[in-house]
């Protein structure tokens, strides 16, 4: 496989259905097109090594090829590896034990889980690759509930499946459905390495992009990934994503809601949860209609605008329902109130609540000056971090060595970008963002 090449995958937000999804109600998640992980796969400067460089978490580690030989060349261990390569529904504890010595030096939690995810997928997907450096850059805030770990897992899975010859070729022009299925399967394994029991939602959104509808199985309480309903032709919806930096415990928030549902007010909570599920169903229906309503005549434009206003109204309603069950936070309400005061659009919390992030779908009649004023006040007065992006958009994608080598100036800039430890989001977007540059990403 020719080097260097790049892979990328987006983050995600929950549009509708936070908390109600726990009680088997439908929910909708979507990719965040401009918040992404980028992975550069290049030749390592140190011979006979595999290197992982992830400056966002201050992590760089090299493993010797000899570290892997005990797994790949020993007859008994290679049989254990072969079993793990076939077991795409869960982690092989035999392989986990074989990887323990390679992780022994890593005590910091972030570093350990990043390395565990990396090594598990590496030995399963491209165990004979050598002299390779994996360099990660992300424009996603880590730990904000925006699917940063899934974005990383998908980027790694795509790169390693490509290196291992499981998908595509040097002349890869399009990722097939089977390619994406393989990537999603292994990214889910990567998520298991990091989180233990992930839902499968984050990696699916990061792989396929756009949006999906999901709900728990009422019989066993798990999310059946085979029942995901993907919205492929998703309308680009402009939004401001705001990260409050307010820490929160998803576990505590879910437990607090559970007390309301099962102990204190079950009859009150039932219609609220039902309404949240209905927001998800109607929201998906509206977005589907928006994606199909593309005419330029007066009637089509009017219909499109009416649908968009309905979507904004549903966002407002869903946030109100979340407030009613006690999962908002004064810091989130500041954003909601400011967006209402400035008539920017409709704001709701996204994710577990209690802090974290909000999304603001923007009205169509506002100016860039109004948007900038909104962002500036949030940043200057409250030290929040804002991201102007679109809801939905490209999922995982790959920039082959063939395409990267076509422009040596761009190639040089890419390497400079990854070597610079203090690269800004704007610098990354200007050079790499799919759809924002002329780079021929394959998706």
UniProtKB/Swiss-Prot annotation:
UniProt KW Lipid metabolism keyword: yes
Binding site for Mg(2+): 149, 191
InterPro entries xref list: GHMP_kinase_C_sf, GHMP_kinase_N_dom, GHMP_knse_ATP-bd_CS, Mev_gal_kin, Ribosomal_Su5_D2-typ_SF, Ribsml_uS5_D2-typ_fold_subgr
Enzyme active site: 202
Intracellular or extracellular location(s): Cytoplasm, Cytosol
Cofactors (names): Mg(2+)
Regulation: Farnesyl pyrophosphate and geranyl pyrophosphate inhibit mevalonate kinase by binding competitively at the ATP-binding site.
Family: Belongs to the GHMP kinase family. Mevalonate kinase subfamily.
Physiological role: Mevalonate kinase; part of the second module of ergosterol biosynthesis pathway that includes the middle steps of the pathway. ERG12 converts mevalonate into 5-phosphomevalonate. The second module is carried out in the vacuole and involves the formation of farnesyl diphosphate, which is also an important intermediate in the biosynthesis of ubiquinone, dolichol, heme and prenylated proteins. Activity by the mevalonate kinase ERG12 first converts mevalonate into 5-phosphomevalonate. 5-phosphomevalonate is then further converted to 5-diphosphomevalonate by the phosphomevalonate kinase ERG8.
Further details from the record: Present with 3300 molecules/cell in log phase SD medium.
Protein name: Mevalonate kinase
